[in-house]
């Protein structure tokens, strides 16, 4: 199969991902996980090409998000752990996040106090 890409013919802007290189990088991350026992999460802010989430999910443990919509994307398309963090959360956001996230990072003691009962 010829995988040569005529970059001049692509519409711009275009995002081109070399799946072979992506897999190679994922193998490196898997090696780190295997050697250390750590979990590695996909930062969706940095890479939210959800077309590749099934592939990435073979190697990584979950996603990080900083909004309800990002968390929803990770929950629906990645299907593993969903971690969320933000400077502050509104009550409506917490209500939307609780059914779909596994971990919430609060940025202040006031936020912890405000939502302590909700997150138990």
Where are the language model's segments positioned?
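Generic N-terminal amphipathic, Lys/Arg-enriched alpha-helix
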Residues: 1-17
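N-terminal glycine-rich anion-binding loops that anchor highly charged ligand groups
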Residues: 2, 24-28, 33-48
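An N-cap/entry alpha-helix motif that binds or orients negatively charged groups
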Residues: 12-20, 24-28
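Active-site-proximal beta-alpha core segment in soluble small-molecule metabolic enzymes
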Residues: 38-120
């Amino acid at each position: 199969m010829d995988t040569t890409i005529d970059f001049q013919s692509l519409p711009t802007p275009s995002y081109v991902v070399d799946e072979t290189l992506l897999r190679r990088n994922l193998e490196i991350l898997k090696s780190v996980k295997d050697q250390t026992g750590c979990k590695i999460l996909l930062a969706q802010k940095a890479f939210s090409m959800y077309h590749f989430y099934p592939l990435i999910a073979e190697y990584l443990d979950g996603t990080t998000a900083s909004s309800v919509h990002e968390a929803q994307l990770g929950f629906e398309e990645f299907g593993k752990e969903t971690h969320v963090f933000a400077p502050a959360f509104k009550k409506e956001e917490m209500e939307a996040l609780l059914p779909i996230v596994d971990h919430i990072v609060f940025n202040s003691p006031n936020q912890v106090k405000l939502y302590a009962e909700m997150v138990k």
